[in-house]
Design a protein with these regions (language model features):
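Nucleotidyltransferase catalytic core that binds NTPs
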Residues: 1-169
Length: 169
């Protein structure tokens, strides 16, 4: 999780676009091409640390749900959405993603069903065609963070990454 994610979370909550955000650390996404380097427990801990840096008025609206990292096998968004919907049957569910992910959504498992189950909030990102809302997203790349080419994470997360020797940082 990096500063770009935290900026999006803050903007969505401050602008009252959403009431609550469920942050799901990634499990084993098939389209990414390789398994995550950090363990599920480490990814969850980094999310908790990052969210702790937000003002209470924002962080109190964020829940970290480990559903994907606890699941065996590949992680499909549709399965996560079904689980969230069963936990919150009376709520409207939004799936929030950057324009980079949105550009590949038709390749996702059961993509047609996914579109019927959730409203998608697509965050415009520099370098990708605009499809969604513009909240002045920061130009931060998770790939660059993992490669050690970006320092765009809260210092507490960077320290955790160094202490646990994650991503060669």
């Amino acid at each position: 999780i990096h500063n770009g994610h935290l900026h999006v979370i803050s903007q969505l909550i401050e602008k009252k676009i959403i009431d609550r955000l469920i942050l799901v650390p990634a499990g084993q996404p098939l389209l990414r091409g390789n398994a995550p380097i950090a363990s599920g427990a480490n990814r969850r801990a980094m999310c908790q640390l990052a969210i702790s840096t937000l003002p209470t008025g924002i962080s109190s609206h964020v829940e970290i749900n480990p559903i994907e990292i606890l699941r065996d096998g590949p992680s499909y968004a549709i399965d996560t959405v079904e689980a969230v919907r069963s936990s919150y049957p009376d709520d409207e569910i939004f799936l929030i993603m950057g324009a980079d992910a949105y550009s590949k959504i038709d390749q996702w498992h059961r993509a047609d069903e996914l579109h019927t189950m959730v409203s998608i909030i697509c965050i415009n990102r520099p370098g990708f065609p605009a499809h969604g809302i513009d909240i002045a997203a920061l130009d931060v790349s998770a790939t660059a963070v993992r490669a050690g080419l970006s320092a765009d994470v809260p210092e507490i997360v960077a320290a955790f990454m160094r202490e646990n020797r994650l991503y060669d940082n």
